[in-house]
């Protein structure tokens, strides 16, 4: 997870 919503 991070500042953007990808599949991370």
From Swiss-Prot:
Belongs to the allatostatin family. The modification Leucine amide is found at residue 8. GO terms for biological process: neuropeptide signaling pathway. Keywords: Amidation, Neuropeptide, Secreted. GO terms for cellular component: extracellular region. It comes from the Eukaryota. May act as a neurotransmitter or neuromodulator. The keyword Secreted applies. The keyword Cytoplasm does not apply. This is Carcinustatin-15. It is found in: Secreted.
């Amino acid at each position: 997870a991070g500042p953007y919503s990808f599949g991370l």
